Structures are given as structure tokens and as C-alpha cells.
Amino acid sequence: MSKYGDVVVISLNHRLNILGYLDLSPFGEEYKNSGNAGNADMVAALQWIHENIANFGGDPENVTLFGQSGGGMKVWTLMQTPAADGLFHKGVVQSGCIDHFVSGNSAEQNGKAIVTSLLAELKLDDVKALETIPYAQLAAAYNKVAPEVAKTGAYVGGNPLANDWYLGDPLEVGFTEHAKTIPV
């Protein structure tokens, strides 16, 4: 892209699955926004871009997000995330849809079912102990329990949890005032 136009292209990463979107809120206030860790990573990256893009010849007041499929969906979710307001100004959604995200009680029930299974698989007594488990071991445990937990309808994907961090599915709650100003 930058070869063919006067643009600075930055790619960002974020946590996915149980590291990025597992709702641990039923286990305490400290986990209130655990189901939004992946989106929080993207907001942190956008803050860094806003503060540093000029050093690379970019304009912090002219940032366009783009994504394909799940990445396109992330553009929509960031439009509903107040912490991202003003950090990007346009969006390109390539084959990404506004999906009806799991929220509220369903997300809590999913999180509780998955965590209960993980704790049993890892022979742990407390959700706090999950924070000390190496990623490879945690992922292996999740892969082992996920098929059985999925039979109950519980699922962790790449969607944020609707709360005060992410305001929710715009098809249900409407777009935020800021989102209405972003050309897509």
C-alpha cells in the first residue's frame, strides 16, 4: 500500500479467544472487563498510533482502520468502544459483518462454564490461579474442554462483551454518536 500511495501502514495484534474475550466477570469485580481484553489491546495500539504516527510521516487526525472478515468486525466493534473515540477517523470493512454478539447473562454463563471446566482440567481451585498458567498449558486445557463445553452452547470467540467498555451491538443499541461521524 505505502509503495503506491502516500500512506503509513501499521498492522496491530491483539489477544483472541480465552486470552482476549473470555468473560470472567462472574468471578469478581476485578474481572469486569476481561471479556474485552482483545479490544483493549486494539485501543492501546490506536493510542500508540495517535501519539507516534507523526514520527513516521503520518497524520494522527487522519487514521483509517481496515479489516477483512473478523478484522472488519473489529472495525465495527471499535466504533462502539468509547475509549477509541477520536483515535480513528474512517473505516474500511471488507467482508466483515455486524454480528449479534454474545452479551449479558449468556456471556457470563459461557465464561462460568468454560472457567469451571478449565479449573477442573488444570486441577485448580481458584480463577486467580489461571493467571499463573503458561499459555501453552492453558491453550491445551481449553482445547481439551472446549468440545464438551460447546455442547452446552458455551463459546469464546473474538467478540467483545457489551458493558460500559463496549456499548454493544449497533443493530440492538444503535450506533454511538461518534460512530455516526465515521465514514465506512
Language-model features, listed with the residues they occupy:
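Substrate-access "cap/lid" subdomains that shape
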Residues: 85, 94-184
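Short glycine-enriched nucleophile-adjacent loop
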Residues: 72-84
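Short, solvent-exposed loop/turn and secondary-structure capping segments
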Residues: 20-24, 76-78, 101-106
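Cap/lid segment of the alpha/beta-hydrolase catalytic domain
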Residues: 1-43, 47, 51-55
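Alpha/beta-hydrolase fold nucleophile elbow
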Residues: 49, 56-69
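Active-site nucleophile loop of the alpha/beta-hydrolase fold
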Residues: 14, 68, 90-102
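Short secondary-structure junction motifs
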Residues: 58-61, 73-75, 88, 124-127
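Loop/turn elements at helix/coil->beta-strand transitions in domains of secreted/extracellular proteins
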Residues: 4-10, 59-63, 84-90, 180-184
